[in-house]
């Protein structure tokens, strides 16, 4: 998909394609459509990030709360989004043994209790051995810095999902903006 | 459900229950959870409305763009949310004859083209005869005032959905705020 195609989309198509760039937050894609045309992947991505950065703290926490636990209830029940299912699978989180899964559930619960949002991590940049270590480490962080870290992970996930959709075309098919 | 119960919910439960108060915008419910405890339905509702009002214009348009057309593609394909299905059914929009449905589709398309968001109306406060008349009327409005009208309809829908969930209990079970 190239940017000429992206810039020609009506809002219905745009939300169909980009609605889950930020997990379960089609509102953000639907808002970003207002900023078209986009000059390339980076420009499009920057509009997603600017929207996130401009939200009040409750809204930023709200974004995090729309994310599933890693190796959590949604994975067990088969109710993950397609994107999250693929990402957790690539990190090996869909094939944990019972002990590792219970250990992660316990850490996830502690994290949710401490910060009021779930542990968010770009799973594709991690693996089954690293996830619980990183979770245990971030559990010790201060709430203010942890919110920033978690939003940084949301942006990494968004970048990877946008790259999946736009791939190499996004750089080669830059369009002239008016 | 009374407010004691609502105020005791963790964010996962809260988003499960209130995630579609604003159509397909669980981000808003997830943000509102930060404002607990709530003294009653009106207080809870005001936090939803305050979040909507504080969004930049693109975000407000984004909320509208997460709504389906009335008697549109999602209804035909069976992909409406449960709440929207019920509301459109109560307004008689699920049993239109072909001529009426095509007329509405045509008006919806004109409206989306003119304003850049879909026609949003609290269907439960309307009926199959009124919907196309109101759509044709609002199609003539100025974009600025039409955005305000449409967000007012989002709030009416949210109010009705909250009342469905909280009903009479919400007034009788007020809790003391700290």
Curated annotation (Swiss-Prot), chains A, B:
Major location (coarse): other
Substrates-to-products reaction catalysed: 5-hydroxy-2-oxo-4-ureido-2,5-dihydro-1H-imidazole-5-carboxylate + H(+) = (S)-allantoin + CO2
UniProt keyword Zinc present: no
Protein's cellular compartments: Peroxisome
Keyword Translocase: no
GO cellular component: peroxisome
Pathway assigned in UniProt: Purine metabolism; urate degradation; (S)-allantoin from urate: step 3/3
Residues that coordinate or bind substrate: 68, 84-88, 119-123
InterPro entries linked: OHCU_decarboxylase, OHCU_decarboxylase-1, OHCU_decarboxylase_sf
An MF annotation (GO) of this entry: carboxy-lyase activity
Source species, domain of life: Eukaryota
Pfam family, one: OHCU_decarbox
Top-level EC class as recorded in UniProt: lyase
Keyword terms of this UniProt record: Decarboxylase, Lyase, Peroxisome, Purine metabolism
GO biological process: adenosine catabolic process; allantoin metabolic process; amide catabolic process; AMP catabolic process; dAMP catabolic process; deoxyadenosine catabolic process; deoxyguanosine catabolic process; deoxyinosine catabolic process
Family: Belongs to the OHCU decarboxylase family.
Record function comment: Catalyzes the stereoselective decarboxylation of 2-oxo-4-hydroxy-4-carboxy-5-ureidoimidazoline (OHCU) to (S)-allantoin.
UniProt name for this protein: 2-oxo-4-hydroxy-4-carboxy-5-ureidoimidazoline decarboxylase
Organism from which the protein derives: Mus musculus
């Amino acid at each position: 998909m190239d940017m000429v195609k992206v810039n020609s989309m009506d809002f219905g198509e745009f939300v169909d394609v980009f609605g889950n760039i930020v997990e379960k937050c089609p509102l953000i894609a639907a808002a970003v459509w207002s900023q078209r045309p986009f000059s390339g992947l980076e420009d499009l991505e920057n509009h997603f990030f600017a929207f996130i950065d401009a939200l009040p703290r409750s809204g930023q926490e709200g974004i995090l709360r729309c994310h599933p636990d890693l190796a959590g209830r949604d994975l067990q029940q088969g109710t993950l989004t397609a994107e999250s299912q693929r990402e957790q699978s690539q990190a090996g989180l869909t094939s944990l043994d019972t002990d590792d899964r219970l250990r992660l559930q316990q850490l996830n619960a502690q994290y949710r209790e401490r910060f009021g949002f779930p542990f968010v991590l770009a799973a594709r940049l991690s693996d089954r051995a690293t996830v619980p270590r990183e979770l245990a480490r971030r559990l010790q962080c201060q709430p203010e810095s942890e919110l920033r870290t978690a939003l940084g992970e949301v942006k990494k996930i968004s970048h990877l999902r946008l790259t999946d959709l736009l791939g190499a075309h996004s750089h080669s098919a830059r369009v002239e903006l008016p």
